[in-house]
Every structure is written in C-alpha cells, then in structure tokens.
A protein has these predicted regions:
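Positively charged n-region of N-terminal signal peptides that target proteins for export
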Residues: 1-4
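Short, solvent-exposed loop/linker segments at the N-terminal edge
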Residues: 25-28
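Primarily extracytoplasmic ectodomains and periplasmic/lumenal surface modules that are beta-strand-rich
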Residues: 40-45
Length: 148
C-alpha cells in the first residue's frame, strides 16, 4: 500500500511538471511589399524603359508626412520597389508612393504582430492599393502597378 501511494505521488508530480514550454522559439518575418510599376499600355517597366528614374521615388507616410524607408532592386532589367518596414508591429499604415512628386498609388495596410504557440509572426488583416490598377502575383509576392 505504501508503495502504491509513493508511486501515485511520483506520477502526479511528474504530470504536474509537464508544461507546454517552448523549447524552440520560432519567428517568421513579415512578408515585404514588392511593387513593379509598368506602363498600362505596353506592360513595360517604367524604370527599365527609362520613363522614370528610381532616384525620384518617394514613399511618404500620410499620417505625419515623414519619409518611409524602401529599397529599389535593379538587376537584369528587374526593377522593383520593396517596402520591408510593414508588419514588424501591430499597426495601420497609409503610404503614398510617388515618382517625381506625383502620387502613383496609395498603400493601406492593417498589420497585426502576433505570438501563438511559441511562434511570432505577422498577419495582414487588410491591404488596399488605391488610385491605380494593379495585379497581385501570390507566388512571387509581387504587385504590378499599371500607370498611364
């Protein structure tokens, strides 16, 4: 009988010690926003055909007028604007993407930074592109913006 009680105590201690601790933390960085801007009539990238120069691109936060960091990738006639700053925290962003001080389109994103099951990640609740026609290629994660 004494052994049974000790055995039960040992089992109950063992079971109460089991927690859902995270031995491995995981993190998935937010997906960047990538934009290829093309001529609506020809479908040709406006930086590849030299209609515009990338040095005249501005990304402006419409909330406070501040400039937003971005990258411009220009390799082998692949000219893409990339914004990597969205989704690192829970936020709503409203950006104006401009070339030569002309607004090409606006980007609205409702982003949520979450931690579930020991993993941190971003969820985009809403994404809106306004003032331009566009297509989204889910496989490439690329928005093609059509301008006149």
């Amino acid at each position: 009988m004494k052994k049974s009680i000790i055995y039960l105590l040992f089992i109950s201690l063992f079971l109460t010690n089991c927690k859902n601790d995270c031995n491995k933390l995981c993190f998935t960085p937010p997906e960047p926003f990538q934009f290829e801007i093309v001529d609506a009539k020809t479908g040709i990238n406006v930086f590849t055909n030299n209609t515009y120069e990338s040095r005249y691109i501005k990304v402006v936060n419409l909330k406070d007028g501040s400039r937003v960091d971005y990258n411009f990738i220009s390799e082998n006639n692949y000219n893409v604007l990339t914004i990597n700053t969205i989704g690192w925290e829970t936020e709503i962003v409203n950006y104006s993407i401009q070339i030569d001080d002309n607004e090409i389109f606006t980007l609205y994103v409702d982003a949520e930074f979450l931690s579930e099951n020991c993993c941190s990640f971003s969820r985009y609740n809403e994404i809106k592109i306004e003032n331009a026609q566009y297509n989204y290629d889910k496989e490439k994660g690329l928005y093609t913006i059509f301008i006149n």
